[in-house]
Amino acid sequence: MAKVYNQEVYVQFLKQHGFVFQSSEIYNGLNNSWDFGPLGAVLKQQIKQALYNFFIKNKADVLLVETPIILSELVWKASGHLANFVDTLVDCKSCKYRFRVDQINAEIKAKKDWNSFKVNCPNCHNQNWSEVRDFNLLFQTEIGVVNNDKRLVFLRPETAQGSFINFKNILQAKKRNLPFAIAQFGKSFRNEITPGNFLFRTREFEQFEIEWFCKPDDANSLFEKQLIMVEQFLQTVLKINPELLKKHEYDQSELAHYAKKTTDFLFNFPHGLKELWGLANRGDFDLKQHQEFSKKSMSFFDSELNQHFLPFIIEPAVGIERLFYALIVSSYRREIINEEEREVLSLPFDLCPEQIIVLPLVNKLKKEAFSVFETLAKTRWRVCFETTGSIGKRYRKADAIGIKYAVTFDFESLEDNAVTIRDRDTLVQQRIAIKELPQWFMKNGQ
């Protein structure tokens, strides 16, 4: 079984190597807010690029859009978020901790159920509770500078609604037949009662959501097709360890207000088996709601059937930070080599923030080694150069941050115009002529 370490191991590892830092750390930090450092920002960008390449690039039926973070209050009335996007919470009067009710007891589904259970506070073990109440997760703000001209608006909790309200615009502009999809990357915001577990649940996060519009009769087959696509991406592109993944289909009683069917890919995070990527059949709920509230038709005309109807929507949705965290957990390991422990981040070659490192064996060879670096830097790979520390320590650091190949320029290189390439995962070393390096990486970069 794949090894999963406790959360603090990943937090400290990612901070030490420049992937993720506590936000506002010099001011004692902002609770559950994280900055992506030099390596983390590149890795996050590579994950997004991989998503784009797999799900969008060169796909005639998938269209990319970008919509604003701030949307009209009416959008969220129509979507049901103002009424339904709530968590039920309760406060412990003894220790002042606040909890989501379902975190205390998963059997409690609503406020009316609370009094049926006698539960102790998970923190102080008392039974001294406040009244149970609903808490809306939307962040709200105002636009306008004059008091009587101010309007209430909300920061989006998902990118999906921006895609839905542009359905007819895109249909008219691109003339697509069903099924077709609108895809979107973007920041979303949720005023979570209990954010936590590192990158798993934060108030500000980035999403990738695809909205597939289809005929109602095609919804089930499209759902299954997207399920296969998501699984292929996780296992063949990100190379997530399948031992850490599990599919879970929700009962009807567990579904969100808009959903007809939902299946999640769960991942074994340090805090347990939790949602990584969700796939929902949203039916025609969203288009029907926006049609009703906007008084604008959201129907699709099928010329073959000679009729108008509201398409069903199949939605794969994932948080980029959760993918990032899952990739780290799946890729990171500690092992003993020659009685020494090394940390290894076995990222897929295409995702490595730094793919190749060029190392002079000693500083005397720095100039010649840098010439090799300059040659490789002109290629499409992400290449770095390092001279600090012994060659062994530089190998260990390269392994820890996920660099797949180390290219070492040694004294023999002055004679044979060749270098030693070391593989991060196998530790196999081989001698390659400097002039053949671009071709070698083109063939073996994987």
From Swiss-Prot:
It catalyses: tRNA(Gly) + glycine + ATP = glycyl-tRNA(Gly) + AMP + diphosphate. Its EC number is 6.1.1.14. CDD domains: GlyRS-like_core. ATP binds at residues 190-192, 200-205, 275-276, 319-322. It is an enzyme of class 6 (ligase). GO terms for molecular function: ATP binding; glycine-tRNA ligase activity; protein dimerization activity. It is found in: Cytoplasm. GO terms for cellular component: cytoplasm. One of its GO terms (biological process) is glycyl-tRNA aminoacylation. Belongs to the class-II aminoacyl-tRNA synthetase family. NCBIfam families: glyS_dimeric, PRK04173.1. Catalyzes the attachment of glycine to tRNA(Gly). This is Glycine--tRNA ligase. The lineage of its organism: Bacteria, Bacillati, Mycoplasmatota, Mycoplasmoidales, Mycoplasmoidaceae.
